Design a protein with these regions (language model features):
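N-terminal catalytic cores of secreted or lumenal carbohydrate-active enzymes
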Residues: 33-233
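Conserved, mostly hydrophobic/aromatic
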Residues: 69, 101, 158, 236, ...
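Active-site neighborhood of glycoside hydrolase catalytic domains
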Residues: 213-341
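Aromatic/acidic polysaccharide-binding cleft in carbohydrate-active enzymes
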Residues: 332-404, 421-424
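Carbohydrate-binding surface patches
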Residues: 422-457, 462-464, 468
Length: 475
């Protein structure tokens, strides 16, 4: 009897050992010439010597809310050059389970710099009760764009922010902060008299009570109007790029004044109208953490604000801000715009930003323009980067390197995933996915391929990382 028990024990042990050692791992690799190459590889029994990178699957860090992209008018305009079938393919590449599978979407409240010109939802001067508020323009452009995305992941979470209030609410009564005549090579032609420029540490909004209350109603009506059109705005940030003064739609806010608007007007208005849309502080594009510190020092700043949104130029503030205010959620709100490089260097910049942001507390990451035409230009003539380029003349669709970077991340790292601790936090990120798998994303910045051994808990695998490659290993 004892002999049979021992024999059975060794048989079971051998079977388990064989199963573990034979476990297949999925590896996906992308270079500038070979995109999304998939292969299967067997786990090693043990790696010789110490592993190059250790992943600690039991060291769970922040929850991941997800990755996303931004809906802009010029993106939808570019998509109209495609046949319905080709347009569906592009949308699927961004939002379906087989594509990037974005979980989040950002949309502007009124005109962004990638709108087809300036507009707001109420340009009737001194309409403090918002009787003339209307989102009619969005019903033809942004709302159809968003609804096409919602056909794929119906639980896509949307958030929004304005680039500018209606011009009549601003001190210079213009949608921008600066005349395009002094912008060097940028030719937005905004027709702003340079004497009306708003530059420096100023608030561009008229801080009188009537304007503040009207603007709070403006936000409330926006959220309600979008809900009536089938789009739930789950979070808003009161201003895009709080501390920048460009020649396109913009409005600067001193932190003390932004706190007054949020704490005394916007938050109470949402309460009055029974709106459960979250209010976040942002988007912060100031690299000095003092902006956030000053905001949170104001009375009642912790009453309504649920999180902090940091734009790429404000990423340097993240380490200090997250350490000092650990109880808030953090989002990277806008990926680096670039200058239409749309090449591997753009991928590297974005990868470095993703690593920095997740290692400093963000739980969500938003790319900027998902689709642009072949010029990649904004209405104000700045050519920027994108995930997908549509050539209006040929109908050709090009997927850029950054598209594949986003796919290497978001395709596997969905809401409910957790960031994991790793021994090399410069070129490696690891997550425990929502379905329990470990997802390791590793970048090889060298020109030459290199072998790299990974230890994930008690599991080992040795992978050849191609030169200049982004890789996802699913264990």
């Amino acid at each position: 009897m004892k002999l049979k028990t021992i024999t059975a024990f060794f048989a079971i042990t051998w079977a388990v050992s064989t199963t573990v050692s034979a476990q297949k791992v999925s590896i996906y690799s992308t270079t500038s010439t070979e995109r999304w190459v998939e292969k299967k590889q067997t786990l090693d029994k043990k790696t010789a010597g110490q592993a190059d990178i250790c992943v600690y699957p039991d060291s769970l860090l922040q929850n991941v809310v997800g990755f996303g992209g931004t809906f802009n008018e010029l993106s939808w305009d570019a998509l109209q050059c495609l046949s319905p079938a080709e347009r569906d393919k592009v949308m699927a590449a961004l939002f379906s389970e087989e594509g990037i599978h974005f979980a989040l979407g950002r949309t502007p409240i009124g005109a962004s710099d990638y709108a087809m010109g300036y507009y707001s939802y109420n340009d009737v001067k001194d309409d403090y009760t918002m009787r003339n508020f209307s989102i009619d323009r969005d019903r033809y452009i942004l709302i159809p764009y968003i609804k096409e995305a919602l056909k794929l992941p119906p639980d896509l979470k949307m958030w929004a922010s304005p680039w500018t209030p209606p011009a009549w609410m601003k001190v210079n009564e213009h949608y921008s902060q600066k005349s395009s005549g002094i912008e060097g090579t940028e030719v937005g032609h905004n027709r702003l008299d340079p004497h009306r420029n708003l530059i420096g540490n100023v608030t561009g909004f008229k801080m009188q009570q009537g304007y503040l209350q009207a603007y709070a109603i403006y936000f409330s009506k926006y959220v309600q109007a979008y809900k009536q059109n089938g789009i739930n705005i789950q979070m808003i940030m009161p201003q895009n790029e709080i501390a920048w003064t460009p020649c396109w739609p913009s409005c600067t806010w001193r932190p003390e004044d932004l706190a007054i608007f949020v704490n005394q007007y916007l938050g109470p208005q949402f309460e009055k109208d029974s709106i459960d849309t979250e209010i976040w502080m942002g988007t912060v594009n100031y690299p000095n953490p003092d902006y956030v510190r000053t905001f949170f020092k104001q009375k009642d700043s912790d009453k309504y604000v649920k999180g902090v949104g940091v734009q790429w130029t404000g990423m340097r503030a993240l380490p200090a801000v997250h350490k000092e205010y650990p109880d808030y959620c953090y989002m990277q709100t806008e990926n680096m715009c670039g200058n239409s490089e749309n090449d591997w260097s753009a991928l590297e910049n974005t990868w470095n930003a993703v690593v920095h942001c997740f290692n400093n507390g963000v739980d969500s990451y938003i790319y900027w323009n998902m689709v642009l035409n072949e010029t990649c230009k904004s209405w104000w003539d700045w050519a920027q980067n994108t995930l997908i380029i549509v050539d209006r003349k040929t109908g050709q669709v090009r997927y850029t390197d950054e598209y594949y970077l986003m796919k290497h991340l978001s395709h596997f790292v969905q809401p409910g995933s957790r960031l994991l601790k790793v021994s090399d936090d410069k070129n490696t990120l690891a997550f425990r996915s929502h379905d329990g798998k470990v997802v390791v994303v590793a970048y090889n910045p060298e020109e030459q391929e290199r072998p790299c051994s990974f230890k994930v808990g008690s599991k080992y695998i040795r992978v050849i990382l191609k030169g200049k490659s982004i890789n996802t290993i699913v264990i």
